[in-house]
């Protein structure tokens, strides 16, 4: 029985190490190559293979600065200054989770969200949060802030099977993300808490309020050069 437990434990440890190796090697490759698919995209495709994934890569310099400012105003105003983790946000999330007795808030930065989108799944759990932390730590040490934001903008979800700001700009406005106005950029950034719902509820009061807040603060955010 003891030998069996040891074997199971070794298999478990080996599996964890293989996952870390997969994440590490993927991050090495994506330092210089476009990210053409993510775990979130795969999950969407597996759930309904008849629905195509809409995704188009756009280089950092070809994305409107309006959107860069808007996405950071909405998701991670301290992005340029932290090393992957916003400890004030995490502290607030822990307090809320303790109050509720379950994971209801994440306090996630752009880097953490990207790690989740690339490698993990959406269901909240402490195990997923732990793996997200490891992947974020690796990413922040291997990629520049510019690269992290570039990949994030190209892989984040904006609606059902709709990924990346270029696909979103074409879908919502019939134009490239290169020419998004402040209003348009703020609207797209405001979608992110619940893009599949807001896709069909564009006049939702919470969405419109969030858009106004982003417009108010987007000029104060600092973006990577």
UniProtKB/Swiss-Prot annotation:
Pathway linked to the protein: Cell wall biogenesis; peptidoglycan biosynthesis
EC number: 2.4.99.28
Gene Ontology biological process terms in this record: cell wall organization; peptidoglycan biosynthetic process; regulation of cell shape
A molecular-function term among this protein's GO annotations: peptidoglycan glycosyltransferase activity
Location of this chain's protein in the cell: Cell inner membrane
GO cellular component: peptidoglycan-based cell wall; plasma membrane
A Pfam family recorded for this sequence: Transgly
Record keywords, A-Z: Cell inner membrane, Cell membrane, Cell shape, Cell wall biogenesis/degradation, Glycosyltransferase, Membrane, Peptidoglycan synthesis, Transferase, Transmembrane, Transmembrane helix
Catalytically driven reaction(s): [GlcNAc-(1->4)-Mur2Ac(oyl-L-Ala-gamma-D-Glu-L-Lys-D-Ala-D-Ala)](n)-di-trans,octa-cis-undecaprenyl diphosphate + beta-D-GlcNAc-(1->4)-Mur2Ac(oyl-L-Ala-gamma-D-Glu-L-Lys-D-Ala-D-Ala)-di-trans,octa-cis-undecaprenyl diphosphate = [GlcNAc-(1->4)-Mur2Ac(oyl-L-Ala-gamma-D-Glu-L-Lys-D-Ala-D-Ala)](n+1)-di-trans,octa-cis-undecaprenyl diphosphate + di-trans,octa-cis-undecaprenyl diphosphate + H(+)
Superkingdom of the source species: Bacteria
TM ranges: 8-28
Membrane topology classification: Single-pass membrane protein
Assigned protein family: Belongs to the glycosyltransferase 51 family.
Reported function: Peptidoglycan polymerase that catalyzes glycan chain elongation from lipid-linked precursors.
Protein name as catalogued: Biosynthetic peptidoglycan transglycosylase
Record organism: Acinetobacter baumannii (strain ACICU)
Gene expressing this chain: mtgA
């Amino acid at each position: 029985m003891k030998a069996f437990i040891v074997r199971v434990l070794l298999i478990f440890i080996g599996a964890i190490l293989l996952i870390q190796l997969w994440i590490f090697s993927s991050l090495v490759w994506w330092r210089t190559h476009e990210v053409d698919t993510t775990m979130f995209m795969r999950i969407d495709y597996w759930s309904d293979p008849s629905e195509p994934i809409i995704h188009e890569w756009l280089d950092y310099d070809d994305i409107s600065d309006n959107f860069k400012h808007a996405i950071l105003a909405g998701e991670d105003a301290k992005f340029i200054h932290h090393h992957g983790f916003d400890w004030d946000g995490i502290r607030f999330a822990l307090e809320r989770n303790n109050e509720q007795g379950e994971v209801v808030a994440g306090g996630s930065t752009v880097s953490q969200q990207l790690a989740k989108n690339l490698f993990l799944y959406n269901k909240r759990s402490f195990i997923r949060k732990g793996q997200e932390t490891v992947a974020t730590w690796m990413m922040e040490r291997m990629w520049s802030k510019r690269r992290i934001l570039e990949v994030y903008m190209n892989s984040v979800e904006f609606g059902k099977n709709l990924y990346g700001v270029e696909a979103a700009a074409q879908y919502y406005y019939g134009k490239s993300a290169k020419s998004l106005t402040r209003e348009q950029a703020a609207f797209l950034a405001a979608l992110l808490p619940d893009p599949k719902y807001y896709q069909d509820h564009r006049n939702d009061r919470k969405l419109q309020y969030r858009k106004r807040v982003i417009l108010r603060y987007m000029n104060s955010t600092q973006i990577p050069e």
